[in-house]
Amino acid sequence: MLFVLDVGNTNTVLGVFDQGELTHHWRIKTDRYKTEDEFGMLIHSLFQHKKLSFEDIKGVIISSVVPPILFALEKMSRDYFHLDAVVIGKTSYQTFLNMNYPNPQEIGADRIVNAVAATEEYGSPLIIIDFGTATTYCYIDEDTAYAGGIITPGINISMEALYSNASKLPKIEIQKPETVIGSTTVDAMTSGVFYGYIGQVDGLVKRIKDEKGTNPTVIATGGLAKLIAHESASIDIVEPYLTLKGLHLIYQKNN
């Protein structure tokens, strides 16, 4: 079995692959102050619930956009799994991803892993949208090379900025509103955040297609992918565990 960890700024997604299938997965809050023992005990508890043991795991691979958390996770892997974790961007593992980008070192590990998984499954050209703390758009060109992208504030950041900086506006939940025109302040905010974000997605995808002169398949991943994709006119496929699949694929190709 392979244990995979996708560490984001807000959430960390964990998964176990058995014979190529994602059999278990969990989403936890990212805590950059946790020690290796706290991570070990948390994972032990999650494993116990699914009747898994540390001994079942034969490999560990990590993608992280939060550098301070890596030391604790790598030590946890050694102490609890007795395995040296593979770390995307740090361990000398090949990703088998072609690059048409001037400085590949600045690309986030999660974006690389997503691109590996998406190109393996869907070919090219592609637009990969990852709805995380930041929303990222990655363009894979006709030669199946990573060719750049767009980074915008995530929907949660946009929502928090609204109520944090406007003293009379309340905190709201992200959900589809009943109408576009709100009849209350909360309804108006919900509509603005939700439909404003969908407009951003559809608008940026159209601009990418127009600029590149291609008709790429558009893949969405991340915690809010299903919610946004349901109303978006431009998203073709939702892959909620794209990053976990990419980690598994990279590990398998290197072993």
Swiss-Prot record:
Q: What are the alphabetically sorted keywords of the record?
A: ATP-binding, Coenzyme A biosynthesis, Cytoplasm, Kinase, Metal-binding, Nucleotide-binding, Potassium, Transferase
Quote the Pfam families the UniProt record gives.
Answer: Pan_kinase
Q: Which InterPro entries match?
A: ATPase_NBD (IPR043129), Type_III_PanK (IPR004619)
Which family is annotated? Answer: Belongs to the type III pantothenate kinase family.
Q: Which residues bind ATP?
A: 6-13, 133
Q: Which domain of life is it from?
A: Bacteria
Q: Name one GO cellular component term.
A: cytoplasm
Which Gene3D superfamilies does the record associate with it? 3.30.420.40
Question: What's this chain's function?
Answer: Catalyzes the phosphorylation of pantothenate (Pan), the first step in CoA biosynthesis.
Q: Which cofactor does it need?
A: NH4(+); K(+)
Where is this gene product found? Cytoplasm
What reactions does this protein catalyze? (R)-pantothenate + ATP = (R)-4'-phosphopantothenate + ADP + H(+)
What subunit structure does UniProt give? Homodimer.
Write down how the cofactor binds this protein.
A monovalent cation. Ammonium or potassium.
Chain sites annotated for binding K(+): 130
- Copy the pathway line from the protein's UniProt record: Cofactor biosynthesis; coenzyme A biosynthesis; CoA from (R)-pantothenate: step 1/5
In Swiss-Prot or TrEMBL terms, this protein is called Type III pantothenate kinase
The entry's active site is 110
The EC designation for this entry is 2.7.1.33
Q: Specify which residues bind substrate according to the UniProt entry for this protein.
A: 101, 108-111, 185
Q: Which GO terms describe its molecular function?
A: ATP binding; metal ion binding; pantothenate kinase activity
One GO biological process this protein is involved in is: coenzyme A biosynthetic process
NCBIfam families reported for this sequence: baf, PRK13318.1-6, PRK13321.1
